[in-house]
C-alpha cells in the first residue's frame, strides 16, 4: 500500500498523540490538527482520510460535525469521534451505564471494510462514559457488547465509520488491523 496522508483531528482526548504515533508507525504520513481547523485548510492538505480522536466532552468537538457532513474522504471516528458522527447524522448519544476505561469483549455483527478479520469476537479497550444510543437513519450496525449495544457503525453510502473503542491502544486486540483496514478504504477511495 502506498503512503497515505491521514489527518488526526484533536478532540482533546488523552490518546490523540497515541493515535498519531500508531498511524505513523504503520508507515503513513500523518499530522494532528485542531478540531477548529477550517475545512478549506483541511482540503488544502489533500488528506486521504481523517481520524476523529476521542475527547472528554461533546461541547469541545469543534467543527467535527461539519467535517463528517462536508469533507469527502474516508473518516474513522474513535470514541467521541464515533459519537460525533452519530450526532451529525441524527443519531442519539447518552451517558453509558459503565463509565471509565475497561477491557470489553465486542461481538462483530458484520465484518465490513474496517472490521474485516476481527470477528466473530474481539477484545477491546473502551470507555463508555457516553455512547451512541440510537443509530442515525440508514446507518449499519457493525458491532455490539454486553456494555454497549452500538460499539461500531458505518454510514450507508459514504466511507464513514465509528467505533466506541480505542484501536490505538495496546490493550485492544487487532487494533492495528482495524486501522490498516481503514487505510485500505482510504487507498481505494
UniProtKB/Swiss-Prot annotation:
Q: One MF term from GO for this chain? A: GMP synthase activity
Key words, A-Z? ATP-binding, Glutamine amidotransferase, GMP biosynthesis, Ligase, Nucleotide-binding, Purine biosynthesis
Q: Which domain of life is it from?
A: Archaea
Pathway per its UniProt entry is:
Purine metabolism; GMP biosynthesis; GMP from XMP (L-Gln route): step 1/1
Sequence ranges assigned to domain Glutamine amidotransferase type-1 in this UniProt record: 5-189
**Catalytic activity line of the entry:** XMP + L-glutamine + ATP + H2O = GMP + L-glutamate + AMP + diphosphate + 2 H(+)
**InterPro entries, per database record:** Class_I_gatase-like (IPR029062), GATASE (IPR017926), GMP_synth_GATase (IPR004739), GMP_synthase_A (IPR023686)
EC numbers, comma separated? 6.3.5.2
User: Record's PANTHER family?
Assistant: GMP SYNTHASE [GLUTAMINE-HYDROLYZING], GMP SYNTHASE-RELATED
What name does this protein carry? Answer: GMP synthase [glutamine-hydrolyzing] subunit A
